[in-house]
């Protein structure tokens, strides 16, 4: 009988052995014969299933399967033009009852998405013993590879420190790594969730209120090594406690340690300190008297509770004193009741009982009666009851002084806690110090301790000012005074007093009219208001230059001169030659040169301190017709006549040590000709000094030339007639 099989099943099989325990799909017997059948050289075949979803009892050819999968793969990940929406995912059956998982798909913005929230993907694993590279291509087509190393490939990877952009760090093998792009491990500001660091994170000293502080700053703030020291007051930091003499006087910056609730808003510094100690829940504090040496969280929002070291609260253990924790910080804040080692006593075979009856020996306190099983003398031989007492005070008067607790020698006060940073003390001085154990490299940024003053509204800083030492080690140093408006984010104004003596201002003023100069000046000195009319000089700013041994010195001062009484002050630049260093005064008053800027006459004059005005700087008078009235013609003959009256003389100035003979006119004589030819000035001595008015003289000289010109023209005309 032929054994060529052509049943329903159908997957091509070059060699199949069918046993009683394994049958070809759809075949139970072959020509009615069961058992082992050798199908070598035979095959089974079946047409492709027509249904869209095939059942287990149906089969499919290899071509059918490939033709079915290919469109799905192409549509999911490799869709080509003209298709645009590439959002069909490549899915897989999920585990643990999840129907399906979106493993990978191409999104409309041309990125590859792995997993999805809707599919409950719990994570993506990348298995690599080497490195994973992220390849970026810029606009010019240049590719840059950014590797992500596994610890197996780079075991030192966990030792890499955090670093700022543009800096260079070294890994544990000494290799230099340049940081030139922002990332999670180079910009801590990008961390939006709670992160636990397993290695120390190096940061600079905090500057702003919300900056992370360094260990050095934390130690300094608590008064540790190198911390703040103050003369004239207790050098306790916030949270430190000590024993005050009496409740009759508790300083304003302290609170008693009575286990009371405090408002967090009223004691922000102490609450900040309490949080460093991990305060417990208030319910635990109240229910467990042995936890009352700790801070509690109060109501959890607005209050907190201080330790009850004075034993004031109901049920608290009283009369507490402190002791060290023996190196176990877990015991900190735990309260202990009175305790002492037990005292035992025994005296065998010294008490006699009758008939071995119990209770025949009287006992008191710590003494207990125990009946021995040993025989004693027979009855009637003179045995007696013996009673005994134990009284420790008979050996030392220490015993019995306290009825309920073991008490060492002590005195009683009241425990208090430093709650505020403010203080008041006479003759107080203090230091605010930042310190390093060793010299820092040249150029390292350094800051001294910060002294800060604030005005706070509703718990938020509004205005603040500070003074702080800052600079770069061995390069630059200054003391900075800062004033800032935090609420409205107005830029800080700072004054830097440099180590080389310079004073720098960092903030510019807005230009305004000169009439507003009293309120719009970088450096404004105190106003000098006299209670009565006064004459004298006030120097605003000045400084000396010269030789320290006494010669060639000059002190230059800008100030104001009031003279005479009841007159407007005049701006003056004063130069004091060869002044005395110890007193700052000029022993020879004549060697002083003053330049005056008159606010009334607009004149600039120069003279010495003896009252002599030597020069008056000329100025150009305004001659605009629009500023004049009553304009009339005036003959030039008067000008020529006046010039002819002037007596041209020689003279020597009184102050001129060289006695130089000069030529010119005498002001008093010109004043007699025409008062407009001279100007009068008051000296320091109150006398008038006359000076020639060059402007009037020049104009009259021009008029005289015009008069002479007319006379020449008349004479020329007469000569022409002859």
UniProtKB/Swiss-Prot annotation:
Residues annotated as domain Peptidase S74: 623-719
Record's keyword annotation contains Lyase: no
The keyword Kinase is annotated on this UniProt entry: no
GO CC aspect terms: virus tail, fiber
Residue pairs linked by disulfide bridges in the UniProt entry: none
InterPro entries recorded: S74_ICA (IPR030392)
Protein's cellular compartments: Virion
Keywords in alphabetical order: Late protein, Viral tail fiber protein, Viral tail protein, Virion
Domain of life: Viruses
Pfam families xrefs: Peptidase_S74
Function: Probable tail fiber protein.
Protein name: Probable tail fiber protein
Organism from which the protein derives: Escherichia phage Phieco32 (Escherichia coli phage phi32)
């Amino acid at each position: 009988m032929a054994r060529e099989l052509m049943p329903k099943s159908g997957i091509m099989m070059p060699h199949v052995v069918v046993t009683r325990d394994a049958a070809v799909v759809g075949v139970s017997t072959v020509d009615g014969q069961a058992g082992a059948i050798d199908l070598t050289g035979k095959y089974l075949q079946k047409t492709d299933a027509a249904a869209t979803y095939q059942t287990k009892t149906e089969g499919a050819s290899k071509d059918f399967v490939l033709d079915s999968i290919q469109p799905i793969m192409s549509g999911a990940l490799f869709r080509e033009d003209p298709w645009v929406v590439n959002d069909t995912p490549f899915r897989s059956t999920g585990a643990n009852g999840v129907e399906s998982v979106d493993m990978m798909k191409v999104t409309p913005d041309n990125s590859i998405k792995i997993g999805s929230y809707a599919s409950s993907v719990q994570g993506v694993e990348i298995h690599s013993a080497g490195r994973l590279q992220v390849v970026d291509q810029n606009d010019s087509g240049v590719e840059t590879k950014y590797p992500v190393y596994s610890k197996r490939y780079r075991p030192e990877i966990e030792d890499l420190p955090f670093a700022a952009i543009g800096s260079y760090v070294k890994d544990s093998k000494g290799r230099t790594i340049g940081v030139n792009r922002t990332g999670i491990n180079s910009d801590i500001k990008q961390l939006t969730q709670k992160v636990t660091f397993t290695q120390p994170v190096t940061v600079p000293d905090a500057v702003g209120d919300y900056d992370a502080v360094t260990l050095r700053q934390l130690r300094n703030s608590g008064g540790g090594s190198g911390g703040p020291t103050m003369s004239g007051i207790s050098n306790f930091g916030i949270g430190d406690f000590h024993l005050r003499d009496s409740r009759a006087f508790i300083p304003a910056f302290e609170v008693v340690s009575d286990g009371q609730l405090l408002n967090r808003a009223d004691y922000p510094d102490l609450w900040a300190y309490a949080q460093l100690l991990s305060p417990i829940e208030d319910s635990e504090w109240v229910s467990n008297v042995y936890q009352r040496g700790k801070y509690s969280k109060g109501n959890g929002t607005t209050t907190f509770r201080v330790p009850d070291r004075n034993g004031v609260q109901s049920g608290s253990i009283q009369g507490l004193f402190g002791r060290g924790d023996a190196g176990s910080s877990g015991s900190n804040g735990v309260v202990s009741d009175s305790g002492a080692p037990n005292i035992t006593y025994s005296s065998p075979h010294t008490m006699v009982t009758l008939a071995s009856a119990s209770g025949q020996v009287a006992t008191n306190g710590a003494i207990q009666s125990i009946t021995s099983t040993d025989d004693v003398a027979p009855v009637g031989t003179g045995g007696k009851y013996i009673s005994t007492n134990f009284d420790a005070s008979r050996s030392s008067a220490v015993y019995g002084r306290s009825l309920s607790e073991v008490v060492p020698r002590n005195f009683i006060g009241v425990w208090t806690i430093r709650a505020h940073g403010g203080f008041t003390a006479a003759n107080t001085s203090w230091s605010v110090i930042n310190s390093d154990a060793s010299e820092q490299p040249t150029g390292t940024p350094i800051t001294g301790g910060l002294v800060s003053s604030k005005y706070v509204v509703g718990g938020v800083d509004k205005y603040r000012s500070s003074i702080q030492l800052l600079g770069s080690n061995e390069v630059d140093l200054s003391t900075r005074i800062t004033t800032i408006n935090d609420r409205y984010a107005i830029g800080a104004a700072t004054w830097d007093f440099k180590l080389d003596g310079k004073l720098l201002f960092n903030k510019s003023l807005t230009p305004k009219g000169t009439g507003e100069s009293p309120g719009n000046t970088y450096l404004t000195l105190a106003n000098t208001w006299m209670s009565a009319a006064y004459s004298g000089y006030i120097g605003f700013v000045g400084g000396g230059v010269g030789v320290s041994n006494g010669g060639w010195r000059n002190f230059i001062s800008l100030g104001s001169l009031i003279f005479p009484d009841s007159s407007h002050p005049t701006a003056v630049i004063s130069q004091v030659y060869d002044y005395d260093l110890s007193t700052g005064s000029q022993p020879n008053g004549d060697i002083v040169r003053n330049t005056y800027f008159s606010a009334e006459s607009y004149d600039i004059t120069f003279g010495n301190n003896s009252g002599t005005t030597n020069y008056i700087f000329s100025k150009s008078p305004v001659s605009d017709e629009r500023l004049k009235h009553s304009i009339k013609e005036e003959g030039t003959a008067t000008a020529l006549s006046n010039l002819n009256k002037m007596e041209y003389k020689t003279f020597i100035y009184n102050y001129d040590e060289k006695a130089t003979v000069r030529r010119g006119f005498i002001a008093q004589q010109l004043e007699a000709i025409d008062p407009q030819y001279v100007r009068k000035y008051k000296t320091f001595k109150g006398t008038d000094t006359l000076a020639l008015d060059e402007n009037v003289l020049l104009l009259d000289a021009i008029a005289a030339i015009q008069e002479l010109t007319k006379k020449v023209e008349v004479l020329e005309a007469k000569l022409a007639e002859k």
